């Protein structure tokens, strides 16, 4: 296609909203003639399902729950007045709490103001807050923000070492809907120990975001934590960033959460349109459907040309893959749906994997994110007539053109600048696109049975570990290979898991297990140190 033809196609397919200062360009998705018209009946059905969801229909039948993350930025849309009031009052409480922390009315036990903020959560309880913090944070932050987002001891030690002596002025926010998420519980216990070792009272630094009546809620109440904010069962983790999960950390960091919500709210209004060409989320969903053949046949490579959007791909990995990656459709048919999402940032990726994107296996489509404003203030000319930002823009445009020249399709999303409003709009745009696409391919976007299966399997491993440690302690003079231990436990089918547990136990001194190394690793012998 000639450049002039591409320009006409660009004008024909471009969505631009002057109020949001947001554009969605699908001109480099090769929709065949009549594709949009052919998909229109399915889209109209998707719009109806989305409208019913927003009105309070049970959209997650597995758990008999409503799905209400859209109400978080438009409380008046909630189907019950009590829900509207709870959303409104929670936002007011978040803002009041953050203001009290910033003003020193809520302070560390020594009377000094809090300077640091440690967020403990995993999955949606970390990815959304991390994305918002990284994209909008800066030298003017009211609190320095840190995260425990895994159960990796070394990772937590690294964070604590960076906090250092500021621990005594660190506020801790523990985020878990059920209060029983093991990674988050472990992080809380590790943080508690760090505070106690420093001679500090953990509860005097702690805040919870959790479900009413949860184990965490009970702990916070019993120990008189500084505050408890709600997580509602009608908000899923991956769509919780505009709830207390994301708003409390952002407000404490000093981000304008009202503007974040305003951006999401404005985008929600645009994406409720049933006129497909005037609905940017629908255009995204159609692009995904065409590019992946509606069956996940291609991956989504996310290339934001902005360092502050580095974490956007991680955030979207969960939002898209956990929502769409399903074995069964809503009718119980085995479909193996999903879209794999990965990416880093431009122009770094041009010196990494773009070589394969242009000339290697064609199993992807690209989403470019363009931010027009380079920085606050004037830029240096790195050569006559060109700044570093000009180069970044040039590399984006060049990569887009080079890929399409080879038949590699792409979508480009453009915002004028990064701000709470534009970040809120991007969050809302993708939440709606995921919901519409799920309707198009007939999957439930609001449950995650595979995650639960993984949790159960992990629990079985920990139970088996307990049996192994007990066997070693009962027979301190006996050495076991992995195979011998599996037989001793009458679990011969679990020999590989037994071997991996023994190897891990011996590498750490916590359980008192030693190893005698043999020529073949699977013949290593393990015993209790007594």
From Swiss-Prot:
Stated family: Belongs to the GPI family.
Protein name listed in UniProt: Glucose-6-phosphate isomerase
Catalytic residues (positions): 322 (proton donor), 351, 455
Primary location recorded for the protein, binned into one broad class: cytoplasm
Stretches assigned to coiled coil: none
GO cellular component, one term: cytosol
UniProt keywords, alphabetically: Cytoplasm, Gluconeogenesis, Glycolysis, Isomerase
Source lineage: Bacteria, Pseudomonadati, Thermodesulfobacteriota, Desulfuromonadia, Geobacterales
NCBIfam families to which the protein is assigned, alphabetical: PRK14096.1 (NF010696)
Function: Catalyzes the reversible isomerization of glucose-6-phosphate to fructose-6-phosphate.
Main EC class the enzyme belongs to: isomerase
PROSITE patterns: P_GLUCOSE_ISOMERASE_2 (PS00174), P_GLUCOSE_ISOMERASE_3 (PS51463)
Reactions that this protein is recorded to catalyse: alpha-D-glucose 6-phosphate = beta-D-fructose 6-phosphate
One Gene Ontology term of the molecular function aspect: carbohydrate derivative binding
Gene: pgi
GO terms classed as biological process: gluconeogenesis; glucose 6-phosphate metabolic process; glycolytic process
Subcellular localization(s) per the UniProt record: Cytoplasm
This protein's pathway: Carbohydrate biosynthesis; gluconeogenesis; Carbohydrate degradation; glycolysis; D-glyceraldehyde 3-phosphate and glycerone phosphate from D-glucose: step 2/4
SUPFAM superfamilies xref list: SIS domain (SSF53697)
């Amino acid at each position: 296609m000639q450049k002039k033809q591409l320009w006409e196609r660009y004008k024909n397919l471009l969505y631009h909203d002057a109020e949001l200062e947001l554009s969605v360009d699908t001109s480099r998705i090769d929709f065949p003639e009549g594709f949009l018209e052919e998909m229109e009946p399915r889209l109209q059905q998707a719009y109806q399902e989305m409208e019913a969801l927003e009105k309070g229909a049970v959209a997650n039948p597995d758990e008999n729950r409503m799905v209400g993350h859209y109400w978080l930025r438009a409380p008046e849309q909630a189907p019950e007045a009590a829900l509207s009031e709870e959303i409104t009052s929670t936002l007011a409480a978040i803002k009041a709490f953050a203001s009290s922390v910033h003003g020193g009315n809520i302070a560390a036990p020594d009377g000094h103001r809090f300077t640091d903020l440690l967020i403990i959560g995993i999955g949606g309880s970390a990815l959304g807050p991390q994305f918002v913090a990284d994209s909008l944070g800066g030298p003017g932050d009211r609190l320095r923000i840190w995260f425990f987002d895994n159960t990796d001891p070394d990772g937590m030690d690294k964070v604590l070492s960076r906090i250092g002596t500021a621990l005594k002025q660190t506020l801790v926010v523990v985020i878990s809907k059920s209060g029983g998420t093991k990674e988050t519980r472990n992080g809380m216990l590790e943080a508690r120990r760090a505070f106690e070792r420093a001679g500090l009272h953990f509860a005097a630094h702690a805040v919870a975001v959790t479900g009413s009546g949860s184990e965490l809620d009970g702990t916070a109440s019993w120990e008189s934590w500084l505050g408890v904010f709600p997580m509602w069962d009608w908000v899923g983790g991956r769509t919780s960033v505009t709830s207390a999960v994301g708003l409390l950390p952002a407000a404490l960091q000093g981000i304008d959460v009202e503007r974040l919500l305003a951006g999401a709210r404005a985008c929600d209004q645009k994406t409720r349109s049933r006129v497909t060409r005037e609905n940017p989320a629908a255009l995204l969903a159609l692009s995904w459907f065409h590019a992946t053949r509606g069956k996940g046949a291609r991956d989504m490579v996310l290339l934001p040309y902005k360092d502050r959007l580095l974490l956007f791909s991680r955030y979207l990995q969960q939002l898209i893959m956990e929502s769409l990656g399903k074995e069964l459709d809503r009718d119980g048919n085995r479909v193996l749906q999903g879209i794999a999402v990965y990416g880093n940032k431009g122009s770094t990726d041009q010196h990494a994997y773009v070589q394969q994107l242009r000339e290697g296996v064609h199993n992807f489509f690209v989403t470019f994110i363009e931010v027009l404003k380079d920085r606050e203030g004037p830029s240096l000319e790195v050569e006559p007539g060109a700044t570093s930002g000009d180069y970044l823009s040039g590399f984006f445009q060049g990569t887009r053109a080079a890929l399409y020249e080879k038949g590699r399709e792409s979508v480009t999303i453009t915002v004028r600048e990064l701000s709470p409003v534009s970040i809120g709009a991007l969050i809302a745009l993708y939440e709606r696109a995921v919901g519409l696409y799920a309707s198009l391919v007939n999957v439930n976007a609001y449950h995650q049975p595979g995650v639960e299966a993984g949790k159960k399997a992990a629990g079985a491993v920990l139970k088996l570990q307990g049996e192994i440690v007990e066997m070693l302690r009962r027979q301190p003079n006996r050495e076991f290979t992995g195979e011998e231990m599996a037989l001793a436990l009458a679990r011969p089918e679990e020999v590989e898991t037994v071997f991996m547990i023994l190897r891990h136990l011996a590498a750490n001194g916590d359980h008192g297990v030693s190893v005698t190394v043999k020529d073949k690793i699977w013949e290593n012998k393990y015993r209790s140190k007594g």
